[in-house]
């Protein structure tokens, strides 16, 4: 059976296209007393970008902090903030949820849009296709490129027991606004780590057992764009990286990621690392599985003067190490894409432990 997967319904791309947001949202406002919820990374407080938000009188602006990886408890807190606002007299769901920021902010926006129409805690839905009700209309506006969160069907969350996404067709954004100008102020190291998330998406997709002509076409183009951005640093690198993120996300939508992402989930869960740097730390020790990709990755690191932290796992207790292994091992589709249906014979607990202990 071939997958019949959902994609983002509408996309606008171009420098300055953020200015069209008011027109885009106007068509979704159902009544004069309706409202939208804006989730915006708090690094933009008192910024020029905040002043450009097309807020209406009853709209709700929630500043989100993404110093840590998005957690299910935080999603539940934000969802309750919206529900409390509704109960203050509006008595209706918002007409839309808009996420403005990097991958973590976009994941939070996706999760809140889902949880406003589904009961319980977001932790109840960590897994594959557990969501029953469609999300609120939701929009992504990336201010950092690489994660592919703007096109993916997952919202990656750290819960009480595991780091695992809410994977559902209902998670996919209805609209994305891709304005390269919004990414121009990103710190260089953060831009690199997030860009490498995209590069690693491509490596894992293009070398995986789930590879097909669809995922290959998107993956190869995204890989070429990553090379232009991180090895050649030609003109319009912000626009190219934004499109690499989009294409890389589309590539894994019809295939899957692999070993690096599985190990990174374990690292992030126990050490509370951000996804991008967690991927970089793990990928640097995966020459055995991705020799060409790791070689090129190291070339990119050298060109951009990136030094990764070392020895993160060396003094770790056995309980934490076992928890990392547990988190990584539940990601069956990632391992199968990387190593095939018999992956458990190759990637044993001892093998994963050996890889982690190098980090």
Region spans (language model):
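Glycine-rich phosphate/pyrophosphate-binding beta-alpha loops
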Residues: 146, 250-274, 279
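Glycine/threonine-rich beta-strand-loop-alpha-helix active-site module
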Residues: 73-80, 85-181
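C-terminal charged capping/lid subdomain of soluble metabolic enzymes
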Residues: 6, 298-359
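ATP/NTP phosphate-donor binding region
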Residues: 1-96
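Short glycine/serine/threonine-rich phosphate/pyrophosphate-binding segments
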Residues: 18-21, 45-48, 104-110, 148-151, ...
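Carboxylate- and glycine-rich phosphate/diphosphate-binding segment that chelates Mg2+/Mn2+
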Residues: 154-254
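Active-site pocket-lining segment
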Residues: 265-318, 322
């Amino acid at each position: 059976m071939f997958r019949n997967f959902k994609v983002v319904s509408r996309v606008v791309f171009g420098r300055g296209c953020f200015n069209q947001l008011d027109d885009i949202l106007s068509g979704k406002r159902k009544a004069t007393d309706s409202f939208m919820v804006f989730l915006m990374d708090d690094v933009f407080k008192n910024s020029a970008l905040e002043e450009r938000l097309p807020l209406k009188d009853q709209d709700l602006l929630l500043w989100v902090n993404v110093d840590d990886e998005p957690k299910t408890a935080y999603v539940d807190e934000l969802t309750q903030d919206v529900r409390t606002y509704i109960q203050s007299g509006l008595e209706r769901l918002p007409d839309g949820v808009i996420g403005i920021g990097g991958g973590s902010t976009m994941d939070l926006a996706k999760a809140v849009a889902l949880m406003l129409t589904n009961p319980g805690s977001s932790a109840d839905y960590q897994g594959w296709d557990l969501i029953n009700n469609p999300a609120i209309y939701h929009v992504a506006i990336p201010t950092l490129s690489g994660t592919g969160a703007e096109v993916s069907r997952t919202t990656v969350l750290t819960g009480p027991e595991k780091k695992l996404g809410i994977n559902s067709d209902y998670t996919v954004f209805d609209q994305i606004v891709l304005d390269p100008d919004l990414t121009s102020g990103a710190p260089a190291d953060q831009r690199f780590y997030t860009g490498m998330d995209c590069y690693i998406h491509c490596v894992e997709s293009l070398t995986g057992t789930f590879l097909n002509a669809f995922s290959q076409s998107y993956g190869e183009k995204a890989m070429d764009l990553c090379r232009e951005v991180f090895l050649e640093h030609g003109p319009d690198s912000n626009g190219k990286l934004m499109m690499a993120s989009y294409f890389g996300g589309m590539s894994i939508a019809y295939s899957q990621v692999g070993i690096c992402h599985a190990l990174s989930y374990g690292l992030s869960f126990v050490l509370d690392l951000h996804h991008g740097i967690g991927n970089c730390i793990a990928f640097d020790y995966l020459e055995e599985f991705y020799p060409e990709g790791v070689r090129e990755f190291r070339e990119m690191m050298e060109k951009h003067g990136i030094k990764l932290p070392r020895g993160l796992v060396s003094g770790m207790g056995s309980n934490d190490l076992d928890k990392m292994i547990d988190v990584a091992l539940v990601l069956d589709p990632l391992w199968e894409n990387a190593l095939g249906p018999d992956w458990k014979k190759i990637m044993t607990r001892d093998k994963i432990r050996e890889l982690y202990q190098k980090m």
